[in-house]
């Protein structure tokens, strides 16, 4: 019987592949037989991750591009097509926050750093839209494929301090649903877009907000754990099941859906 969860020989582009979650994604997909496009800004890290995948028997290519620069993305797409001849999937994993956009408790909410907020919005929202414009067009023209966006619990629950990030992720949820409808109507039932909304996972961007230098939890970190029924942070590999499902034929009638992978954070009232 055919394995409907298989991603073997699918060419899947992963943006943000030089980050923590992206690293987990590319390794898991390569282990499952996918051909991975490792897209990121840091050439040294991207090349090393490709080297690691190849040494472990997988197939991958480094695609050096900034997700907010259309010309770089177009060049990356051509490189992938020249190497592999097709693109079957896209994972929009690039994103994150920046210190200047974090709103501290003592900061006047009427004196926000608008420039920083715009930068965070640009990275997270348009850093999802632009790769979709470039790679998604190729996927759609081929007649079959899947696009997976990475959202966040910050799109569903009010999480203090991270306004720009929260707004961007909320917009990604809206974009996912809107674009899924248009893809289905214009290109048929074999082109899909969905999103994964992770709960709280430790990343380079949020580590200083959630943990102290000695590894203990900050007050904010403890609040997150308190409001997560599973009583812990998520691990990157715990996103893989949802990711593979959405990229594979196992989810062929699923589109416009935001899948929560959050240890129950989104459903718990705190009581």
Positions of predicted regions on the chain:
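Short C-terminal tail/terminal secondary-structure segment
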Residues: 2-3, 244, 255-271
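A short, exposed helix-loop element centered on a Lys and neighboring polar residues
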Residues: 132-133, 177
């Amino acid at each position: 019987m055919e394995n409907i969860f298989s991603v073997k020989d699918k060419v899947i582009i992963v943006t943000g592949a030089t980050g923590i979650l992206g690293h987990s994604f590319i390794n898991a997909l390569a282990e499952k037989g996918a051909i991975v496009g490792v897209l990121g800004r840091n050439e040294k890290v991207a090349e090393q991750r490709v080297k690691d995948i190849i040494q472990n028997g997988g197939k991958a290519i480094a695609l050096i591009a900034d997700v907010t620069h259309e010309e770089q993305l177009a060049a990356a797409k051509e490189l992938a097509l020249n190497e592999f001849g097709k693109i079957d999937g896209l994972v929009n994993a690039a994103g994150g926050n920046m210190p200047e956009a974090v709103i501290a408790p003592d900061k006047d909410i009427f004196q926000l750093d608008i420039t920083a907020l715009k930068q965070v919005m640009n990275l997270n929202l348009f850093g999802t839209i632009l790769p979709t414009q470039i790679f998604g067009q190729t996927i759609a023209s081929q007649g079959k494929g899947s696009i997976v966006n990475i959202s966040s619990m910050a799109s569903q629950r009010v999480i203090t301090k991270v306004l720009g990030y929260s707004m961007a992720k909320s917009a990604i949820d809206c974009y996912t649903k809107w674009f899924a409808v248009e893809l289905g109507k214009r290109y048929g039932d074999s082109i899909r877009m969905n999103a994964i909304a992770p709960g709280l996972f430790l990343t380079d961007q949020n580590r200083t907000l959630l943990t102290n230098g000695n590894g203990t939890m900050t007050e904010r970190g403890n609040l997150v754990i308190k409001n997560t029924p599973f009583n812990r942070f998520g691990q990157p590999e715990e996103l893989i099941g949802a990711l593979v499902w959405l990229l594979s034929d196992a989810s062929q009638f699923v589109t416009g859906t935001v899948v929560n992978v959050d240890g129950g954070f989104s459903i718990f009232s705190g009581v």
